[in-house]
């Protein structure tokens, strides 16, 4: 293919060259560009096997024995056979030098910054932060009037008549600079009041002293951690070398700092500025008047200010820590000098002596720990930096209410313009908290000064944006060095307020979801523990009643969750439990493992459940009794170690119980599948046999009796072991009658139940598709059994239903007894749909029995054509072998008397016969499942032994 193309290209090239050279006389005369292409013929051989091997990677070999990394023979990594020399585990510096926790944390942060570009799009992140910054600026501009540009009518305002800065002679500036240089470079002389030790070296110049003085003052106010921050930031600045311990001026800096903390030192820079202020007004009064006259403007020409209630409320209230030793020393010095105490920020006089201060510490702490929020409410100040939140708030008096979040504890605000209320007198006497001068108060707390109204919206907006977008947005805003956002610097006076608002918005953003999640997690465990402990003391019904009274959510969790600490607790349902809609996943293990004997009436069933619950409380198994006793005894006095040990034990028991449940479920599933296959084969054979040669009714009865006999032999007494607890035995005989106390429910409930039965029966008779309506309360797992009958088979059964129904009465009491010996949970199957139905109404098995009895009585009436009086006389004898209570018989009799006049009686008899045949097959299904579960439990018991 290449050969032909190459020849064509050569021909074109030659022709093109000739054409170009022909008309123009030169090679460059035409527009065509010369192209030289060579082509060679090539044969391709198709090798499918090698291509397939290449695709499957058969030519690749594992690199250094690692099958995850496959290389071919041309890969350069094949030359690397030993990486131990380059392994980071052996060759890094960290092997010799162990990092502390803080250093490891910093190193991890550095690694995150190093490799940030691997998993983050930095350009997109920067664009997003820029967008957020623009939004913040727009939001601030919307709130304020042209607040993007600070417009002032001062001396800096441009005036055309005045000379500009370039034209202005710079003599005055030179003079001021020279004066400053002279002041800064003059040698430092220690003031008279400061007695510096002889071994401490003084700074050479006044400028150096001023830097040391201001640094010491800042560290005294802000706390010792700011000294570390300053040292890190100013590491390259030679003027701050005195912060290093080996510097010759460090002892002088420490001496000044100590003197400031003890109150023996006054700042020289402040005193100088005060002197200038005092001397200034006397000399410059006339000049100021002239300036005022020159720059006077009518108030209407000024920019409009926001007039809001905030201006009245927002008064700068400085928070002073009364427990600080410096404040105590100042008060003591003032009391010793017997000078009148200066009023504080709000005009309240300071405490005159140390004794009064200690006695009144709760009042002072209550007063000074408040500060006003923008909405007029008062709020507790957040703890100073470097102090643990728990220890800080535990030292506060008991009158101060403290919430879990630092600095967001709002109290009832006093009316605006008044001071916060003092604490009640009872709080001081009831709490054992005295005045605390703890070690944590050695660090001076940050004075949270609410900003003025023009700055406060900016701080609030930025704090809200940072809480929403994260701390990276704050660092990006801080890096822009915008004058409006100077409060982001830690040395700024409004930084503490900004930090407080940021924490407030952070908690507002993330507090609700975590709180809801924590309450949702705590609720079921609390109710379950309470239920188990109460069941150990007073029996299960009382525990159910107590937990039920605590709220609908807790009642639901308490009734449905009976697995506490990994042990399967026997669920003793009180009559109220039938009105509770239980969760599907919670009831599944209960339905599998609860073994109760059932009778035909609901009252007997409830009384038997009561009897079983009392017997299980009276004779508990040894595996489950000790934990409940431990909970009873050690509930009031559980230490931290005991709690941890108990939690570890509970986790271990949880794992063991979960493993046992999984094994049981797996075994039951496997055996269930095998049993189901065998049952399907047997049913298919029976069905084909009935289609080929229909059996007479007596033979069908014998067949069904034989199947039930086989199932009865399979039901052996076998205890189920789940979670270290034995459940009651299965027995083939019907149970004894329980006590009359539990047997007799109120008569009103009986009447309501009768009414419900009559309504349901009349509803099922009035519908035309009887087959579907009668089998509705069954679970979804039996839908195949319901619909497996073809239409031809249904018609055959319908034609024979009249003659069969009287004869089948012969073996029906036996089947009823056999059904009675099967537990309710197994008869219903373990599906959640069935369990839900059971909680609302009677079990499907009882409905099944009632429908059978109804169809039999109707068929009897049709075949024998007896009078109503005879039929009424024969009815008690027909039901005497089956029912123990009188109310079901009466209800059946009354329902039959009402339904005699119904026009659709014939259709009802036919459909009831079909339903009874389908029900017999479903009952066989259920018995097969029971056998499978029992076989699985036997296998589990033998493997455990």
UniProtKB/Swiss-Prot annotation:
Question: Zinc: present as a keyword of the record?
Answer: no
Q: Which residues carry this modification: Phosphoserine?
A: 283, 601, 621, 829, 831, 899, 903
Q: Where in or outside the cell is it found?
A: Nucleus
- Which keywords, in A-to-Z order, does the entry hold? Acetylation, Coiled coil, mRNA processing, mRNA splicing, Nucleus, Phosphoprotein, Repeat, Repressor, RNA-binding, Transcription, Transcription regulation
Q: Where do Pro residues bias regions lie? A: 412-425
The segments carrying the SURP motif repeats are: 211-253, 458-498
UniProt feature, compositional bias: Basic residues: 753-787, 795-810, 835-861
Query: In the record, which positions carry N6-acetyllysine?
Result: 315
List residues, modification Phosphothreonine: 639
**InterPro entries documented for this protein:** Surp, SWAP, SWAP/Surp_sf, SWAP_N_domain
Q: Name one GO cellular component term.
A: nucleus
Coiled-coil annotated residue ranges, if any: 632-686
Sequence ranges of Basic and acidic residues compositional bias: 9-21, 169-178, 589-598, 643-679, 733-752, 811-821, 895-908
UniProt GO MF annotations: RNA binding
Region of interest (Disordered), residue spans = 1-28, 157-190, 269-298, 332-355, 403-438, 512-566, 589-680, 714-921
Q: Which GO terms describe its biological process?
A: alternative mRNA splicing, via spliceosome; mRNA 5'-splice site recognition; negative regulation of mRNA splicing, via spliceosome
Per the record, where are the segments of Low complexity compositional bias? Answer: 335-352, 426-438, 514-527, 615-630, 871-894, 909-920
Query: What Pfam families is this protein classified in?
Result: DRY_EERY (PF09750), Surp (PF01805)
Enumerate composition-biased segments (Acidic residues): 284-294, 528-540
Q: What does this protein do?
A: Plays a role as an alternative splicing regulator. Regulate its own expression at the level of RNA processing. Also regulates the splicing of fibronectin and CD45 genes. May act, at least in part, by interaction with other R/S-containing splicing factors. Represses the splicing of MAPT/Tau exon 10.
* Name of protein: Splicing factor, suppressor of white-apricot homolog
Organism (species): Rattus norvegicus (Rat)
Q: Which gene encodes it?
A: Sfswap
């Amino acid at each position: 293919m290449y050969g032909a193309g190459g020849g064509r290209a050569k021909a074109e090239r030659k022709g093109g060259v000739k054409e170009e050279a022909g008309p123009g006389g030169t090679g460059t005369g035409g527009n065509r560009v010369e192209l030289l292409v060579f082509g060679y013929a090539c044969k391709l051989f198709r090798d499918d096997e090698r291509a397939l091997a290449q695709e499957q990677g058969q030519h690749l070999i594992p690199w250094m024995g690692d099958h995850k990394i496959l290389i071919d023979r041309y890969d350069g990594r094949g030359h690397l056979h030993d990486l131990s020399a380059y392994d980071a585990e052996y060759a890094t510096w960290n092997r010799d030098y162990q990092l502390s926790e803080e250093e490891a944390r910093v190193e991890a942060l550095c690694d995150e910054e190093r490799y940030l570009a691997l998993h983050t799009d930095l350009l997109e992140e920067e664009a997003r932060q820029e967008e957020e910054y623009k939004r913040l600026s727009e939001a601030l501009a919307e709130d304020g009037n042209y607040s993007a540009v600070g417009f002032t009518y001062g001396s800096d305002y441009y005036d055309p008549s005045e000379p500009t800065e370039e034209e202005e002679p710079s003599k005055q500036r030179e003079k001021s600079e020279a004066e400053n240089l002279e002041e800064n470079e003059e040698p430092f002389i220690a003031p008279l009041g400061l007695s510096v030790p002889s071994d401490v070296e003084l700074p050479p110049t006044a400028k150096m002293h001023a830097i040391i003085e201001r640094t010491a003052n800042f560290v005294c106010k802000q706390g010792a951690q700011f000294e570390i921050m300053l040292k890190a930031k100013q590491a390259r600045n030679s003027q701050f070398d005195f912060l290093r311990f080996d510097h010759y001026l460090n002892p002088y800096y420490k001496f000044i700092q100590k003197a400031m903390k003890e109150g023996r030192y006054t700042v020289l820079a402040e005193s100088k500025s005060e002197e200038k202020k005092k001397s200034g007004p006397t000399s410059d009064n006339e000049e100021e008047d002239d300036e005022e006259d020159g720059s006077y403007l009518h108030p209407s020409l000024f920019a409009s200010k926001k007039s809001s209630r905030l201006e009245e409320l927002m008064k700068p209230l400085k928070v002073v820590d009364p427990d600080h030793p410096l404040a105590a020393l100042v008060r003591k010095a003032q009391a010793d000098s017997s000078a009148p105490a200066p009023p504080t920020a709000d005009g309240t006089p300071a405490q005159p002596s140390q004794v009064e201060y200690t006695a009144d510490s709760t009042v002072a702490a209550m007063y000074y720990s408040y500060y006003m929020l923008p909405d007029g409410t008062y709020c507790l100040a957040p703890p100073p930096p470097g102090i643990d939140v728990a220890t800080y708030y535990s030292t506060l008096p008991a009158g101060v209410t403290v919430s879990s979040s630092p600095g967001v504890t709002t109290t009832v605000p006093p009316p605006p313009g008044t001071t916060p209320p003092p604490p009640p007198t009872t709080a001081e006497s009831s709490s054992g908290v005295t005045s605390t001068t703890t070690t944590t108060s050695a660090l001076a707390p940050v004075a949270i000064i609410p900003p003025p109204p023009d700055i406060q919206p900016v701080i609030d907006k930025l704090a809200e944006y940072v809480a929403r977008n994260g701390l990276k947005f704050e660092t990006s805003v801080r890096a822009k060095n915008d004058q409006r956002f100077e409060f982001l610097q830690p040395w700024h006076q409004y930084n503490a307020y900004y930090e407080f608002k940021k924490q407030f918005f952070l908690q507002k953003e993330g507090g609700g979801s975590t709180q809801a999640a924590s309450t949702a997690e705590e609720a079921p465990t609390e109710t379950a523990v309470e239920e188990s402990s109460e069941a150990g003391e007073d029996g299960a019904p009382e525990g159910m009643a107590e937990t039920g009274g605590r709220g609908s959510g807790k009642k639901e969790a308490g009734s449905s969750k009976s697995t506490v600490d990994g042990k399967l607790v026997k669920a003793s349902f009180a009559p109220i439990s039938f009105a509770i809609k239980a969760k599907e996943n919670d009831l599944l293990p209960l339905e599998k493992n609860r073994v109760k004997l059932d009778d035909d009436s609901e009252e007997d069933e409830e009384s038997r459940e009561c009897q079983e619950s009392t017997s299980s409380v009276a004779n508990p198994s040894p595996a489950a009794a000790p934990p409940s006793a431990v909970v009873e005894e050690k509930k009031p006095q559980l230490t931290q170690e005991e709690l941890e040990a108990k939690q570890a034990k509970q986790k271990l028991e949880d794992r063991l119980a979960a493993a046992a449940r999984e094994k049981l479920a797996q075994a039951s599933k496997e055996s269930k599948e095998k049993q189901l296959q065998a049952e399907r084969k047997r049913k298919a054979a029976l069905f084909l046999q009935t289609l080929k040669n229909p059996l007479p009714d007596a033979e069908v009865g014998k067949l069904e009796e034989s199947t039930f006999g086989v199932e009865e032999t399979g039901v052996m007494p076998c205890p189920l072991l789940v979670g270290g607890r034995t459940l009651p035995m299965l027995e083939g005989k019907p149970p004894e009658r329980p006590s009359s106390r539990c047997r007799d429910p109120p008569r009103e409930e009986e009447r309501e139940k009768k009414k419900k039965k009559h309504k349901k029966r009349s509803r099922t008779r009035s519908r035309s598709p009887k087959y579907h309506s009668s089998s509705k309360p069954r679970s979804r797992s039996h839908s195949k059994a319901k619909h497996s009958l073809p239409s031809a088979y249904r018609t055959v059964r319908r034609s024979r239903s009249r003659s069969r129904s009287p004869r089948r009465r012969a073996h029906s009491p036996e089947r009823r007894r056999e059904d009675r010996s099967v537990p309710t949970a197994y008869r219903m199957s373990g599906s959640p749909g069935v369990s839900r139905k059971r909680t609302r109404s009677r079990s499907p098995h009882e409905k099944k029995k009632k429908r059978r009895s109804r169809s039999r009585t109707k068929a009897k009436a049709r075949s024998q054509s007896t009078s109503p009086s005879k039929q009424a006389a024969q009815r008690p004898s027909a039901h005497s072998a089956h029912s123990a209570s009188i109310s079901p018989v009466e209800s059946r009799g009354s329902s039959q008397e009402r339904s005699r006049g119904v026009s659709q009686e014939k259709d009802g008899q036919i459909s009831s016969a079909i339903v009874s045949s389908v029900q017999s097959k479903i009952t066989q299904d259920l018995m097969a499942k029971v056998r499978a579960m029992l076989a699985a439990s036997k296998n589990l018991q033998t493997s455990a032994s």
